[in-house]
Amino acid sequence: MPLDILQNRNNLLDVTSDEKQTEGALRPKLLAEFVGQNKVKNQLALLIQAAKIQGRVTDHALLAGPPGLGKTTLAMIVAAECGVSIRMSSGPAIQHAGDLAALLSSLLPGELLFIDEIHRMSRVAEEMLYLAMEDFRIDIMVGKGPGATSVPLELSPFTLVGATTRAGLLPGPLRDRFGFTARLDFYSPEELLQVLIRSARLMEIQYYDDALESIAVRSRGTPRVANRLLRRTRDYLLVSNSSEILSKEIALKAMDVYEVDSLGLDRLDRAVLHAIFDRFSGGPVGIKTLSAYLGEEAETIENSIEPFLVRQGLLVRTPRGRQITDLARKHMGFKEDLSGFELYL
């Protein structure tokens, strides 16, 4: 399989800089505006209300789940509902104890600290975070060698909200210090339809119901993908100048242009399935081997591609590696000839 299929790709879960402003405008600001994840919303509402009644900061919270389900949005909502400001950072940006110390010492009383990809923090920073979360203080080492001393630094009370796509990589002592942990689930087509209806209203798009329904079923169970496909469909509607109202026919034409198929697979999804079939005879194949062949990070494949393919029944994980299913062969039109060479239509 030619690898140039991955060049200049547009992964539906990636957020480009020119889309951040639009995405921010579509973000719900309060729990009442947030569609889906009802159990998590109710639990967060209780957490926030209890903290207000007791006059303390909200408990630390860990939000886990695949990309694009609303972890960052929920963190911003928690800050808004608590009436406090939010400071945003990420695990890869906190690699030294000094990085974390500077961040924590600058927090205002009651402020919410959001750390995305918290599982990617360095171990030394994680260990400093234990004491900060539990006692609102950190120990600063002064001096070097045998004469070095530890000086305690008191911190303003704060709330930490961590987000992760790989909760299993967090050490137990860190997970245990979160007072609340939630896993966000993929959305149903019906929930995604509600997301699209709200976004279409904010974007002032006129539509027929079946147009949004056709986008919802192709949105991979992910609101970020749903909103991205809606923006791309709106672009197609404006450029084609064929109608002022978004119809199902126009939506499907836009999906064809952006290479999103009936199950919501994009180019990279199909490239993974093609690679396993063409190069590795349908599998099983190890993630490192697959990553090297595709020229794509293993973490991207594991976090952004595999969950949806597994959920759709197109891919299975076995002790020996990844393997495509009969459903994937049927959907992709893969064929095996009698000579043992595998072909696809």
From Swiss-Prot:
It catalyses: ATP + H2O = ADP + phosphate + H(+). It is an enzyme of class 3 (hydrolase). GO terms for molecular function: ATP binding; ATP hydrolysis activity; four-way junction DNA binding; four-way junction helicase activity. DNA binds at residues 317, 322. GO terms for biological process: DNA recombination; DNA repair. CDD domains: AAA. It holds the Pfam family RuvB_C. Residues 3-187 are annotated as: Large ATPase domain (RuvB-L). Residues 262-345 are annotated as: Head domain (RuvB-H). Keywords: ATP-binding, Cytoplasm, DNA damage, DNA recombination, DNA repair, DNA-binding, Hydrolase, Nucleotide-binding. ATP binds at residues 26-27, 68, 71-73, 134-136, 177, 187, 224. Mg(2+) binds at residue 72. Homohexamer. Forms an RuvA(8)-RuvB(12)-Holliday junction (HJ) complex. HJ DNA is sandwiched between 2 RuvA tetramers; dsDNA enters through RuvA and exits via RuvB. An RuvB hexamer assembles on each DNA strand where it exits the tetramer. Each RuvB hexamer is contacted by two RuvA subunits (via domain III) on 2 adjacent RuvB subunits; this complex drives branch migration. In the full resolvosome a probable DNA-RuvA(4)-RuvB(12)-RuvC(2) complex forms which resolves the HJ. The RuvA-RuvB-RuvC complex processes Holliday junction (HJ) DNA during genetic recombination and DNA repair, while the RuvA-RuvB complex plays an important role in the rescue of blocked DNA replication forks via replication fork reversal (RFR). RuvA specifically binds to HJ cruciform DNA, conferring on it an open structure. The RuvB hexamer acts as an ATP-dependent pump, pulling dsDNA into and through the RuvAB complex. RuvB forms 2 homohexamers on either side of HJ DNA bound by 1 or 2 RuvA tetramers; 4 subunits per hexamer contact DNA at a time. Has 3 domains, the large (RuvB-L) and small ATPase (RuvB-S) domains and the C-terminal head (RuvB-H) domain. The head domain binds DNA, while the ATPase domains jointly bind ATP, ADP or are empty depending on the state of the subunit in the translocation cycle. During a single DNA translocation step the structure of each domain remains the same, but their relative positions change. This is Holliday junction branch migration complex subunit RuvB.
